[in-house]
Regions:
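Structured domain cores in non-transmembrane regions
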Residues: 31-63
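Glycine-rich, aromatic-bearing surface loops/beta-hairpins
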Residues: 61, 65-128
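Residue-level detector of solvent-exposed, low-hydrophobicity positions
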Residues: 11, 28, 34, 44, ...
Length: 128
């Protein structure tokens, strides 16, 4: 299951360094959420979930911070209770589960996409 984790730059650094990360919850696309939007496009629903995670990242850090949504693929064993558009994460995530990072630089509904392999290249800039 694809999920989007709200994460801060220091947390991202620790995740990369250790190879694992404990997350309590993540944002997902599910049938309930699908009915909330006037689209059938899976891509648009994925965007909404990733944007919600990125906005939560900004809330965790402060209004002028970068919002980060880490796209991860959860295993069946990691999927906890699902409530609306969020899922509980039952065990640590591994860096190998990371697919990409979506970055919000403003209050606008726009996200920049970075492949997992690009994250180390930009991390120092995001930490500054």
């Amino acid at each position: 299951m694809r999920a989007y984790l709200a994460i801060t730059p220091p947390e991202l650094q620790r995740f990369m360094d250790s190879g694992s990360f404990k997350a309590a919850r993540a944002w997902i696309v599910n049938q309930i959420q699908s009915g909330d939007f006037e689209t059938d496009s899976e891509e648009e629903l994925e965007f909404e979930s990733s944007l919600q995670a990125a906005m939560q990242s900004r809330v965790m850090q402060g209004p002028n911070a970068l919002g980060m949504a880490l796209a991860v693929d959860l295993t069946i064993e990691q999927i906890g209770a699902i409530a609306e558009n969020q899922v509980g994460v039952l065990s640590d995530l591994l860096w190998s589960q990371v697919q990409s990072l979506l970055l919000s630089e403003s209050d606008e509904p726009e996200l920049s996409w970075f492949a997992a392999q690009e994250i180390p290249t930009y991390l120092a800039q995001w930490l500054a």
